[in-house]
Amino acid sequence: MPRLVAYLLANDKKMIELEVNSVASLIEVSRSAFQGFGKTVHWFRGQTSAAWGLVPTVHRDYDQAGEHNLAAHFRLSASTRHTKAPDLSDLSAWMSLMQHFGLPTRLLDWTASPLVALYFALDSEPHTKAAAVWGLVPSRLNAVSAFKAEETFVLSGPEARPLLLAGMSRGPVVEDVLAVVAQDIDLRMTLQQGAFTLHGTSAPLNERPGANGYLAKFIIPQSAREQIKEELWFLGIRRSGLFPDLANLALELTTDQRRTPRRRVV
């Protein structure tokens, strides 16, 4: 711990970037890294490649016209496929729904749980590379936004509306990023302790000026992936607990049977 504190003090002008090799080490270094921010909320995001920046899918793969087309077609077609489709004017509800069902949006998923973030960092390909868990202080991000407010915003609130309009209704471009929370639309979002950053720009969040004031990066080397996955399994951080449907329960049970082939579920 003293060596970690010395590192943090020596690098206070740079974004914190530390390697973790176990669940315990992530808890230790993240608590130490965020100590200087006081008793405030922290969010985490797992990414399967440590080389990836913090950019939503829609900004990686689409221009603004493409983003508008995706949103428009989804909203027009959803009412016959989803019995609880929001009113067409409720942009925040539509943005949450699009994100929930996997449409590329200007939202990035975060979680209040570092263990949930670790699960997503290690859950999918590429397994041969280092993964990462990002840490964020949402109130500090919003403090350097256009609103200069050290608090967490609501996706349905006035602060987020200009960014929603830009993505869904051909409003003017707003090159800002906000940390927002939204109403839980199903049990999955509750179990994953979900939150979001809302991006009005394709510039990676980690490359924005002042990112060291609200971001930290914890790198998981390839050599530690399997050990950490075993630790998460032991701690009960499993797929069916984060995706509470029968398809994911079946996938988890199948995986568990492969893990312990002689065990039988009676």
Where are these regions (language model features)?
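Catalytic-core elements of nucleic-acid end-processing and repair enzymes
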Residues: 1-266
